[in-house]
Amino acid sequence: MARYLLLAAALLLTACSSTPKKPIADDPFYAPVYPEAPPTKIAATGSIYQDSQAASLYSDIRAHKVGDIITIVLKEATQAKKSAGNQIKKGSDMTLDPVYAGGSNLSLGGIPLDLRYKDSMNTKRESDADQSNSLDGSISANIMQVLNNGNLVVRGEKWISINNGDEFIRVTGIVRSQDIKPDNTIDSTRMANARIQYSGTGTFAEAQKVGWLSQFFMSDWWPF
């Protein structure tokens, strides 16, 4: 009975330890930053044109300060392939010829004293893994911080509700202001310390998850 209780406890612990934290919309970590603009004092000059509200037709529209919006073009592609194998062979062979004494075989209970023993073992294991992923699209993010060297910390998320579930994209990383294109976009491959997450919640996402019993058989707790 104790063995069954221990096995049940191990199954429960495995299931609990492998349950990831569910993502939520409006996560404070991805909340946008709203810069505080100082109040603008407009002098009453009687003219329609105001210097404080003027903008150049040739000014740079690229994001460069906290709160600005930048569009990140997702161009991610990864491919990994790995194969491994090992083979172990072991064998032993031992022979003991009959023992003679006084011109006759020594015996025990009428059975001659001789020995022949042979043993062999052959273990072979092979494993192959081939995985490829790609992600294309775009997402707009906010500049959260401007570092001392001019690099920009960007972060943002996008949630899309479809039927009975939600799909989301989250992006965070560090970009150089020099890598931002004139149309205020930057490729995701130009981001440092990039964290790109594309997943979903709801019925469709839950259907793709592995059950807790299957997780146990595929975990390190399974002894075979």
Swiss-Prot record:
Membrane topology note: Lipid-anchor
Gene Ontology BP annotations: bacterial-type flagellum-dependent cell motility
Gene Ontology MF term list: cytoskeletal motor activity
Extent of the signal sequence: 1-15
Residues linked to a lipid group, N-palmitoyl cysteine type: C16
Subcellular location: Cell outer membrane; Bacterial flagellum basal body
GO cellular component, one term: bacterial-type flagellum basal body, distal rod, L ring
InterPro entries per the UniProt record, alphabetical: Flag_Lring (IPR000527)
Superkingdom, taxonomy of origin: Bacteria
Covalently attached lipid (S-diacylglycerol cysteine), positions: C16
Alphabetical UniProt keywords: Bacterial flagellum, Cell outer membrane, Lipoprotein, Membrane, Palmitate, Signal
Family to which the UniProt record says this protein belongs: Belongs to the FlgH family.
NCBIfam families per UniProt: PRK00249.1-4 (NF001304), PRK12698.1 (NF009338)
Reported function: Assembles around the rod to form the L-ring and probably protects the motor/basal body from shearing forces during rotation.
Complex formation: The basal body constitutes a major portion of the flagellar organelle and consists of four rings (L,P,S, and M) mounted on a central rod.
PANTHER family for the chain: FLAGELLAR L-RING PROTEIN (PTHR34933:SF1)
Protein name, UniProt field: Flagellar L-ring protein
Gene: flgH
